Each structure stands twice: as C-alpha cells, then as structure tokens.
Amino acid sequence: MLVIINGADTDVPESTTVTNLINQLELTGRIAVEINKQIVPRSEFDSRLINNGDMIEIVHAIGGGQST
C-alpha cells in the first residue's frame, strides 16, 4: 500500500504497525511519529496500524542546548 513518509511516496506491506515501519526503515534512538497530523504515543507503536494513504512524519529527537 502507498503512504507518504516525510513527503516521499513509500510502499509498505499491509498490516504494518508503526513499530514494523520503524524497523523496516532501520531507525533507532528517540523517535517521534505523526500520522495524519496526530502524534502517535510510543505506547501505541506496536498496535497502531498504518493505512493506505496515511501521511506520516518521523523525526529523531535530538538533545542539546546552550552550554555556558
């Protein structure tokens, strides 16, 4: 099925969960996922299914700040 990930058309298998998608994309670390402009809580990654046509944004959380 076709979804949009960070602005790019991407084909993913049916019954793909957020966790499956993260693993397929080989992403690690602290990740935030938004599907159709709704943040997906990490507690739902294993159960939240990706649907055909979903618009998905995935970002890495990066720590940092100003040191003095």
Question: What residues fall within each predicted segment?
Answer:
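Ubiquitin-like/PB1-type beta-grasp interaction modules and other compact soluble beta-rich domains
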Residues: M1-T68
